[in-house]
Amino acid sequence: MTAIKLDGNLYRDEIFADLAQRVAALKEKGIVPGLATVLVGDDPASHSYVKMKHRDCEQIGVNSIRRDLPADISQEELFAVIDELNADDSCTGYIVQLPLPKHLDENAVLERIDPAKDADGLHPVNLGKLVLNEPAPLPCTPNGSISLLRRFGIELNGAKVVVIGRGVTVGRPIGLMLTRRSENSTVTLCHTGTKDLAAETRAADVIVAAAGQPHMLTADMVKPGAAVLDVGVSRKDGKLLGDVHPDVWEVAGAVSPNPGGVGPLTRAFLVHNVVERAEKLAGL
């Protein structure tokens, strides 16, 4: 058995087509959504990610604003840039590209962002609203992951879902999102303290691998026919690798490739959050 490919590029193109129409409708009302990025330092991976985000904006018709800053910027200088974007009406939403240099306090930086302009959905206020099931920008990778499963008809209602990884960007929020009434899944959150990870994953209908450990999920850990999302990214010998071993494709019913699975949807839902806020401000 060879798994169905959960093609994130295909679904991203569908989302972009919809967003482009929505942006065109906003422009007819004189409103141009704007996405800003704040990039500190010269990390090649971060520069690549930011470049792709601005290319996405160009494709959809969203105005893009860049703030590329030196690696030795002080906390107060970075706060000043964030305060500027908070006050800039042309900036509908923005992100601070992580990771930041070690001398900067990431949590303090994220807390400085206006929660309404938090395009990543990772501000403490917005994560708190997720816990309370109140409307707020949703974290992009979990939102993209769940939407990808829905796009390809993977049943979530009543499904046993195992999430591997407890990070704030994926593991913790996706568990909250999957247990909403709209998804109604039963979620087990696994991590480095889990005693028998394989026993947990073999019982799962859906596995979300977000540990950042190359090829850690192997075929013998997967129930035949299960759906597997490969979310984790790591580098080995200069090569980008996901968490899912290639042999999983011979056992699982559906697998998201990495790259080309959840990654494109993370970017798509980043722009989605910006367009959605622009529509809200326009009263649409």
From Swiss-Prot:
CDD domains: NAD_bind_m-THF_DH_Cyclohyd
Gene Ontology CC entries for this record: cytosol
Chain coiled-coil ranges: none
Listed GO biological process terms: L-histidine biosynthetic process; methionine biosynthetic process; purine nucleotide biosynthetic process; tetrahydrofolate interconversion
Chain positions recorded as NADP(+) binding sites: G165, R166, G167, T192, V233
Stored Pfam families: THF_DHG_CYH, THF_DHG_CYH_C
Pathway listed: One-carbon metabolism; tetrahydrofolate interconversion
Alphabetized InterPro entries for the sequence: Aminoacid_DH-like_N_sf, NAD(P)-bd_dom_sf, THF_DH/CycHdrlase, THF_DH/CycHdrlase_cat_dom, THF_DH/CycHdrlase_NAD-bd_dom
Catalytic reactions on record: (6R)-5,10-methylene-5,6,7,8-tetrahydrofolate + NADP(+) = (6R)-5,10-methenyltetrahydrofolate + NADPH; (6R)-5,10-methenyltetrahydrofolate + H2O = (6R)-10-formyltetrahydrofolate + H(+)
Entry EC number(s): 1.5.1.5, 3.5.4.9
Annotated keywords: Amino-acid biosynthesis, Histidine biosynthesis, Hydrolase, Methionine biosynthesis, Multifunctional enzyme, NADP, One-carbon metabolism, Oxidoreductase, Purine biosynthesis
GO molecular function: methenyltetrahydrofolate cyclohydrolase activity; methylenetetrahydrofolate dehydrogenase (NADP+) activity
Membrane among keywords: no
Gene3D superfamilies: Leucine Dehydrogenase, chain A, domain 1, NAD(P)-binding Rossmann-like Domain
Entry annotated with the keyword ATP-binding: no
Protein role: Catalyzes the oxidation of 5,10-methylenetetrahydrofolate to 5,10-methenyltetrahydrofolate and then the hydrolysis of 5,10-methenyltetrahydrofolate to 10-formyltetrahydrofolate.
Quaternary structure annotation from Swiss-Prot or TrEMBL: Homodimer.
Family, as annotated: Belongs to the tetrahydrofolate dehydrogenase/cyclohydrolase family.
Name this polypeptide is given: Bifunctional protein FolD
